[in-house]
UniProtKB/Swiss-Prot annotation:
Known role: Minor protein of the capsid that localizes along the inner surface of the virion, within the central cavities beneath the L1 pentamers. Plays a role in capsid stabilization through interaction with the major capsid protein L1. Once the virion enters the host cell, L2 escorts the genomic DNA into the nucleus by promoting escape from the endosomal compartments and traffic through the host Golgi network.
InterPro entries reported for this sequence: Late_L2
Source organism (scientific name): Human papillomavirus type 60
Name of the gene this protein is made from: L2
Motif Nuclear localization signal boundaries: 2-11, 515-522
Disulfide pairings: 20-26
Superkingdom, natural source: Viruses
Cellular localization per UniProt: Virion; Host nucleus; Host early endosome; Host Golgi apparatus
Modifications made to the protein after synthesis: Highly phosphorylated.
Similarity-based family: Belongs to the papillomaviridae L2 protein family.
The name this protein goes by in its record: Minor capsid protein L2
Amino acid sequence: MYARVKRVKRDSVENLYKQCQLGADCPPDVRNKVEGTTLADRLLQIFGSILYLGNLGIGTGKGSGGATGYTPLGTARVPASTPGTVIKPTRPFSVPLDPIGSGIPSQPVGGRLPVDIIDASASSIIPLQEVLPETTIIVGGDSGPGLGASEIDIVSEPRPDVVGVDTQPTVYTSIDNTVATLDITPATPPVKKIILDPISSGSEGAAAITFSDISAADLNVFVDPQGAGDRISFGEEIELGPINQPAQFEIEEPPRTSTPGEGFQRVTTRARELYNRFVQQQPTQNIDFLGRPSRAVQFEFENPAFFNDEVTMQFEQDLQEVAAAPDQDFADVRELGRARFSETSAGTIRVSRLGTKGTMKTRSGLTIGQKVHFYFDISDIPAAETIQLRTLGESSHDFSAVDNITESTYINLTETTNEGLIPDNILEDEFTENFNNAQLIFATIDEGESMIMPTIPPGVALKLFIPEIAASVLNVVHPSSEWTILIPNVPDEIIQPAMAVDVYDDFYLHPHLLRRRKRKRLDFF
């Protein structure tokens, strides 16, 4: 058994390349890596002539940034300082010299730095501008009403809160070992100018109220409701538009189903299945196609309790004993699918069923037939006929309806009119009552008529109320002894009902009313 040879690691690329320079064998990968002729280097050279990829750190070397590492952008590299002995240059007489720095104070000979003295009572807030006062120049035009040029004063107030300078002084040592300090004075700030416009908008003078020294603690605000303010505007007034205004859009056609995406896929799949060149299109107007399609295929009786329209119906029929179908369009139908509903281009509903006909049978018993698409278009419900009604009581002239109940009269008690009073004679009628050509009508019966009424013999106090026939009033009749009492005559003969005998007519008695007698026959039977 052979011992396994241990793999020895190859020397570094730098050492191998040095040996190549001395004449040793040089692997091609080492030479290409050191000389920069690898595939990646060539691609960088090719694309570098087209695209500029400088300062991106793209290369085949390490990603460590070298021995010194990466430097952040925008910062300068500060060399690390190593502790050591500082040797200062000397002059004759052994006078030590300090180098002059750029604004950074160095250590003086005495070992002490100049210190700025700060007053203990000064404010702890250091303002941006110090020592130098602000000079304010007020330029005004002609003096307006109530405001003259002599009332404007120029005030300059220094702020001596903090004593010091903004920059550090430069310190150097002289020959006699004395310290000289150079104060750097900051530049003078620009002069502020205030321009007063004396033009007034009205004829009334503007009253200016000045207050003395007012601090934030005792500030008072006076509000006068009777006073009116002036509107001050600078520049042109530009109307601002609404920001983030909601967008308005119109939907061309809203979805008609709750799932438009799935519905569209279903319609597409159904159209491909029912409407293609391999399916025969067969319209029908058979009413049984909507509810009981089996009655259109064959003569049979089906129990409605076991009928299911949601399944595919199959009809077993031998071709040798073919019977005629109730509907000629459904002849030789072997299979009929469930009902499918769709919408036509005219907006009506279409009921479709996919069927298969058994028109051919092979010797092996296989039945072959064409697929047929039976569909029934349900007609839409027409709109009801509208009949224009005519206006009742129409007239050829204009008229106006006046309702006195709905009319209103407004009386203003505070308003007084001087039209005068209306006299009473205006309210009286001017017509005189005249009875010329008048006719007096008595609502009584004629004298020639007589009425026969049964009465009681005289002597009995009885009052009768007889209604008048000619008018709808009541007349009171008092009985009197002078009246003639008419008593109706009683007939002597007894009144019997009249009987008429017609000798020119005859009648036939119904046969069941006659008694049956043996061996007796009537002449008219």
